Regions:
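N-terminal active-site segment of His-dependent metallophosphoesterases
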Residues: 1-71
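Extended active-site neighborhood of metal-dependent phosphoesterases/phosphodiesterases
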Residues: 3-10, 68-129
């Protein structure tokens, strides 16, 4: 098994404020009245926005299992809180993000397709003060 690593580089001209959250455990499918986990994620993101975070590390378990619906809900939560000014986001796969599909490769492929970056992405953030 070969892992392909990706590198993303960001330059910001302000103080770096990093927020770390994890375990939103979003539902893998649309269910009636299934909003608690989504609401908790939105609330957490709102707190990080108020604190001025310009980078967020999501440390695993976006969904309760690998699911396009959960990943779409995750991205929609960021958009609803931050609008077009979404901060740098590093999303890491947790153990639950590897459940639900037959192979871990399928889980990584879905994660990469829906989240927009590989779970093996290295981030470099350069802070420049004027």
């Amino acid at each position: 098994m070969e892992f392909k690593f990706e590198r993303k580089t960001f330059n910001i001209n302000e103080r770096l404020r990093v927020g770390i959250i994890s375990d939103s455990q979003l539902s893998p499918v649309r269910r009636k009245n299934e909003t608690t986990f989504r609401n908790n994620l939105v609330l957490s993101l709102s707190v990080l926005k108020k604190q001025g975070c310009n980078m967020i590390i999501f440390a695993g378990d976006i969904g309760n299992m690998a699911s396009g619906f959960a990943y779409d809900t995750y991205k929609a939560a960021f958009k609803s809180v931050f609008g077009e000014k979404i901060p740098i986001i590093q999303s890491i796969m947790g153990n639950h993000d590897y459940y639900g599909l037959r192979t871990s490769e399928n889980c990584r492929r879905l994660f990469t397709k829906k989240i927009g970056s590989s779970p093996f992405t290295h981030y470099t953030v350069t802070v420049s003060y004027t």
